[in-house]
Swiss-Prot record:
The record marks T102 as: Interaction with substrate tRNA. Substrate binds at T13, A14, V15, G16, K17, T18. Catalyzes the transfer of a dimethylallyl group onto the adenine at position 37 in tRNAs that read codons beginning with uridine, leading to the formation of N6-(dimethylallyl)adenosine (i(6)A). GO terms for biological process: tRNA modification. The gene is miaA. This is tRNA dimethylallyltransferase. Belongs to the IPP transferase family. GO terms for molecular function: ATP binding; tRNA dimethylallyltransferase activity.
Length: 294
């Protein structure tokens, strides 16, 4: 039965999540929900590597172009919207497929955080950063003080436990009603970084600079302007650095972001990664998905 099953495709930037998501949607009668914090913004197409119109014609996409530049889109917004969409997609008899690299979005949806708006979200993020900086010994010491019989000393579960002790949860959203299959994509670091560099060059040839300049002129302080691929050009527009330096900043920040994404998914979520250059890929993914759905 497919009635409560959701596919989730995660991984670092430039690894090939979009292509796999579309293939899965075509083969499994699915609809895609974007799990990317920047693709919600209208008009920011190149720098966010947003699905093209041609790609959108191949499969139904949701949470693309749903906010203006000047509007915020929080984790709370994503969880509420994604839950609504999952329910609607399943009611249509289709398979929901979450595709994205924003780890906090995906984790919050799967684990059912009750974020309660921006204030609670900010406090939770501060606590999470503090807990993540602790050594295993320090983290588990905190857990065992509260629960000496904690069943499994696992970093992800320990952090989750301490967050729930601090913020609690509500019946409204204390956990997900859905069964998720997480599909993680990865590639050898050297290869991934080269793909990232090449993609930035491609974005430049497609008009990224003009897109960034428009954002700089119209909404430089908006949440949308804080994304990688835009903010790096602002010092160039102000005459502080060269264009070459700005492009190198985009590449460097994108590589660092990819590393952070992988760290997040490995440490905080139970993801089995597939090497996109493996001889068995993507057949191995389709086999797992078929078994999961049936």
């Amino acid at each position: 039965m497919k009635n409560n099953k959701v596919l989730v495709v995660v991984g670092p930037t430039a690894v090939g999540k979009t292509a796999l998501g579309i293939d899965l949607a075509i083969k499994m009668n699915g609809e895609i929900i974007s799990g990317d914090s920047q693709q919600v913004y209208q008009g920011l197409d190149i720098g966010t590597a947003k699905v093209t119109k041609a790609e959108q014609a191949l499969a139904v996409h949701h949470l693309i172009d749903v906010r203006k530049w000047t509007e915020n889109f929080s984790v709370h917004d994503f969880v509420m919207e994604a839950n609504r969409l999952i329910k609607e997609i399943i009611e249509r008899g289709n398979v929901p497929i979450i595709v994205g690299g924003t780890g906090l979005y995906i984790q919050s949806l799967i684990e059912g955080y009750h974020l309660g708006g921006q204030k609670n979200h900010q406090a939770m993020m501060e606590l999470r950063e503090t807990l993540s900086a602790l050594t295993d010994e320090e983290l588990f010491e905190k857990v065992l003080k509260l629960n000496p019989n904690f069943p499994e000393l696992n970093r992800r579960r320990a952090i989750r436990f301490l967050e729930l002790q601090t913020f609690g949860s509500t019946d409204e959203n204390s956990g997900s009603d859905y069964n998720f299959l997480l599909i993680g994509l990865n590639a050898e670091r050297k290869v991934l970084y080269e793909r990232i560099n090449q993609r930035v060059e491609q974005m430049m040839s497609e008009g990224l600079l003009a897109e960034a300049r428009t954002l700089f002129e119209k909404a430089p302080d908006a949440q949308a302007a804080k994304g990688i691929g835009y903010k790096e050009f602002f010092p160039y527009f102000s005459g502080e650095i060269s264009l070459e330096d700005a492009v190198e900043l985009v590449k460097r920040n994108s590589r660092r972001y990819a590393k952070r994404q992988l760290t997040w998914f490995r440490n905080r979520m139970e993801v089995e990664f597939e090497d996109v250059f493996s001889e068995t890929y993507p057949d191995s993914v389709f086999e797992k998905v078929t078994q999961f759905l049936n």
